[in-house]
């Protein structure tokens, strides 16, 4: 579509169609924006041993692929946090089960007219 439109524009402007073909082919490839991560650099010398461990996307500061951040939480501290969090939710669930009034009264209490049939059931008039 873009190639046809640029071809029509080239004929209107009096061109020979070479520009239309080059514009059409570049618009079909990535809309003329280029590569998403910059130009590919062809290595001209041997790569370093740890080259695959660096993420180099063409910016000024390549970064390591493996984050080498010091351990901030040890395994036993993480286990304590996990146990505490799960214990909190278990306690909250048990509190909800113990405080559940609907499970203690599985049906709604009946309400009768005339003061809940107090006189009819043998109460004082």
From Swiss-Prot:
Residues 1-29 form a transit peptide. Its main location: mitochondrion. The chain crosses the membrane at residues 78-98. It comes from the Eukaryota. One of its GO terms (cellular component) is mitochondrial inner membrane. InterPro entries: Put_Complex_I_su8. The keyword Manganese does not apply. Belongs to the complex I NDUFB8 subunit family. PANTHER family: NADH DEHYDROGENASE [UBIQUINONE] 1 BETA SUBCOMPLEX SUBUNIT 8, MITOCHONDRIAL (PTHR36401:SF1). This is NADH dehydrogenase [ubiquinone] 1 beta subcomplex subunit 8, mitochondrial. The lineage of its organism: Eukaryota, Viridiplantae, Streptophyta, Embryophyta, Tracheophyta.
